């Protein structure tokens, strides 16, 4: 038995070498990743983005030129919002005012290199500026000015040591300072306007020059380091449209990149970077699209991904409403679920998930989608937190009736990403699971990537976890992955190893799929998903996940559920004798229970595991290379998170392993 494995421990020399600025979710990359842009060999003809920029310039509407505010709303729009804020929406608006960051704490002082410090400054400006225009109280104006002055004081927008002035913080500050400049234009004196305008123009110029198309340049369109900075650029472009002729070029660039971002998104609504990155990055899709829709009259919303994404986040929540089905780089696995360490203050303030659910109100309003409205209301009822509560006033349509969660199917197969979610119902007492078997960015990439020479993949936040599952029951999380990793590995998920080796090109850095043929990944697929009210039966083909030199000819995993028991049947055929290993992870202790049985302890319930007689069992700590600082995310400390049971069959060319996992509820 392994005692108290959910605690996080730093192991070996890597722990002693942990950089002072180690930032798990400073949302970093390793030196081999090209998040945003990549300069390759030039090819003939104009760059595709140049063609898009000319075809869709996204110019500021003529009636908005020379007036402020204009980016997200107008003076007339503010009047209507003020009536709602002081009328039917008073309670919601007051809650947003109570949470304004700019009223609760001072902005980070320059150079503001602590993780997320500059992000918070940008968001703080936006909230305080809107609050002043609704309330007229000088305290909000004073707060906005403090935060805007802080943004101006930062010599570098972002980290001085990793992508300065062109990355996430630059996007946040262009958005915040641009929104503040636009909303407060009429109450700022000329010296203030010039100071803020000059800073906006300077940093928008730097960022736009970096992202401007050049022969051979490609973009990680599907990755958040691309579209978050560009969303900020769009806001800044419309805010200073009258002040610099370059703003038109910035807007056209931002619109062109966003058109690609939407084009490459999975049509089933799934976000391949995982739930944590959906929470962090999806608001920026909304901010960018809202800027184009309002300022340019260019509505780009109507895409399959955005019509379906409310179902992704709904199904990603475990029945307790506060944890998630955490495929990929999501939180810290057992540590976060135990609400230990520093991260829960950010991920679960006050014990409630920071989910940014209010962005669903915007999608519900845009599509007239009662189901999306209902999902947002449900998440609100769970006490979820939003980074920008103040947007609810603009995003939520109070006239749109919300569909109850009982009307949403409790199971869904996201067929592009190859992920199935199932639950017995939408109550906290439900039994639930998720099963994943698909390529990291979805099957649609196979036909799309060759047609878009300006798109390159950066899949570091996806894990080599094909065939893995997450189980929930008896009021608690039963088994699942180990969380965010600097070096993702199949050993961190409930999937299979072949001769002790995991999937794709794991072990070579943060992106386990770098250099691995996507056509081979596309062969990973769910071939059957029969989902019913009381049972489920899923079959997946996994051979494509493993490197050819491992000799796997076929590898099939069948995953079935009925009456509180999951049955996993793995069948392998290989070119030479290999050892097949199945894995089951636990947040707490795993102990032997009989000749071939094991118990995975949980906080609310436990999981009984029964293995084939021939399987050799090993129970050991779960070991993770955690994330390092930006630019070196693959050089983080080695940590223990939870425990893992590994069941291995003797080496053979053909192997069949059957494992049953049964929910054991606590006795009252």
What is the predicted role of each segment?
Residues 3, 24-59:
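C-terminal segment of N-terminal export signals and the immediately downstream linker at the start
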Residues 9-28:
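N-terminal export signals
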Residues 38-49, 92-111:
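Membrane-interacting alpha-helical segments
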Residues 50-52, 59-99:
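Hydrophobic alpha-helical membrane-insertion signals
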Residues 67, 71, 88, 92, ...:
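Short secondary-structure junctions and interdomain/linker hinges
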Residues 277, 282-668:
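Extended polysaccharide-engagement surfaces of secreted carbohydrate-active enzymes
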């Amino acid at each position: 038995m392994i005692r108290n494995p959910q605690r996080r421990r730093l192991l070996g020399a890597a722990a002693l070498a942990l950089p002072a600025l180690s930032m798990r979710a400073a949302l970093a990359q390793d030196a081999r990743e090209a998040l945003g842009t990549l300069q390759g060999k030039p090819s003939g003809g104009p760059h595709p983005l140049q063609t898009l920029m000319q075809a869709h310039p996204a110019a500021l509407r003529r009636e908005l030129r020379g007036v402020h505010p204009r980016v997200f709303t107008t003076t007339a729009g503010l009047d209507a919002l003020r009536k709602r804020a002081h009328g039917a929406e008073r309670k919601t608006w007051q809650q947003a005012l109570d949470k304004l960051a700019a009223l609760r704490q001072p902005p980070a002082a320059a150079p503001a290199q602590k993780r997320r410090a500059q992000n918070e400054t940008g968001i703080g400006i936006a909230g305080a500026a809107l609050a002043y225009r609704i309330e007229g109280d000088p305290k909000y104006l004073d707060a906005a000015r403090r935060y805007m002055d802080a943004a101006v004081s930062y010599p570098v927008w972002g980290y001085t040591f990793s992508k300065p002035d062109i990355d996430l913080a630059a996007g946040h500050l262009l958005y915040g300072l641009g929104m503040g400049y636009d909303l407060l234009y009429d109450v700022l004196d000329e010296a203030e306007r010039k100071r803020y305008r000059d800073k906006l123009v300077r940093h928008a110029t730097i960022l736009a020059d970096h992202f401007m198309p050049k022969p051979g340049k490609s973009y990680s369109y599907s990755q958040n380091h691309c579209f978050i900075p560009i969303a900020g650029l769009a806001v800044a472009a419309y805010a200073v449209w009258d002040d610099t002729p370059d703003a038109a070029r910035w807007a056209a660039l931002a619109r062109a990149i966003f058109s690609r971002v939407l084009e490459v998104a999975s049509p089933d609504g799934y976000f391949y970077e995982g739930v944590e990155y959906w929470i962090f990055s999806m608001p920026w899709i909304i901010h960018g699209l809202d800027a184009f829709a309002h300022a340019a009259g260019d509505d780009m919303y109507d895409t399959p991904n955005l019509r379906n994404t409310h179902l992704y986040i709904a199904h990603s929540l475990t029945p307790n409403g506060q944890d998630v089905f955490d495929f990929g780089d999501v939180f810290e696995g057992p540590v976060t679920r135990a609400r230990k360490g520093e991260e829960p203050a950010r991920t679960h303030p006050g014990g409630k998930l920071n989910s940014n659910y209010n962005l669903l109100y915007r999608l519900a309003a845009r599509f007239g989608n009662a189901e999306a409205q209902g999902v947002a209301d449900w998440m609100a009822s769970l006490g979820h937190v939003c980074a920008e509560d103040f947007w609810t006033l603009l995003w939520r349509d109070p006239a749109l009736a919300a569909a109850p969660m009982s009307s949403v199917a409790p199971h869904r197969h996201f067929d592009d990403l190859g992920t199935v979610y199932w639950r017995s119902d939408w109550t906290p007492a439900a039994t639930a699971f998720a099963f994943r078997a698909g390529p990291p960015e979805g099957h649609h990439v196979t036909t799309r990537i060759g047609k878009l020479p300006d798109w390159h993949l950066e899949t570091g936040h996806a894990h080599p976890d094909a065939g893995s599952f997450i189980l929930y029951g008896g009021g608690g999380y039963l088994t699942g992955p180990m969380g965010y990793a600097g070096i993702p590995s199949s050993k961190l998920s409930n999937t299979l190893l072949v001769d002790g080796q995991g999937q794709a090109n794991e072990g070579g850095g943060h992106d386990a799929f770098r250099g691995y043929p996507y056509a081979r990944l596309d062969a990973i697929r769910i071939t059957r998903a029969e989902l019913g009210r009381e049972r489920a039966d899923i079959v997946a083909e996994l051979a494509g996940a493993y490197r050819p030199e491992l000799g796997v000819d076929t590898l099939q995993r069948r995953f079935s559920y009925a009456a509180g028991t999951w049955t996993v049947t793995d069948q392998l055929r290989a070119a030479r004798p290999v050892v097949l290993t199945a894995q089951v992870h636990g947040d707490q202790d795993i102990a032997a229970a009989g000749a071939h049985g094991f118990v995975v302890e949980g906080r609310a319930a436990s999981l009984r595991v029964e293995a084939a007689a021939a399987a050799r069992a090993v129970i050991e700590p779960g070991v993770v290379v955690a994330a390092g600082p930006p630019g070196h995310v693959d050089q983080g400390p080695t940590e223990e998170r939870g425990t893992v049971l590994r069941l291995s069959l003797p080496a053979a060319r053909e192997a069949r392993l059957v494992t049953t996992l049964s929910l054991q509820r606590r006795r009252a």
